[in-house]
């Protein structure tokens, strides 16, 4: 056990050293790569909960990622919202859409669920591409304002790097707490056998919809 903890501490230390390299070198390339890694890790974290722990195959995960991103961009560009207000608002709207879409979709199983979520992703992509000036079409929305911390604008990769990695760490801790909660135990039971979980008085439909909504906040 002590050896296992020792290895974990060494890996954590190695990870911190690796994370410190981009801001210390201030290399634009490594900083931009680090930002993208953190952003995609956030998406993968949610997918891991849905696919890895709940056992639900979703091929439309990127659709909700896009809905959140476009939602906050539209609120700031077209309606001139403060970015710090637009981000949680877009997240809540995306979670609500995930709940509404998940209610009928997660009643499907296997290949049917995979095809339904794949179709959702294709539909959302078409809507964004054909949205004209509202979504910016294939070119995306220009003029998205920077996040501000007081008088400090998060306008470069270094500042964004220092923001996204602590946020990712917080999300990892929240995910661990979720897995240790009653909902997390329900998800693992559904992954092993949804029929057996249902026979043990677990509301499998509610648990699946809840995790789908939570991971898209």
Where are these regions (language model features)?
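Transmembrane alpha-helices and adjacent helix-loop boundaries
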Residues: 1-215
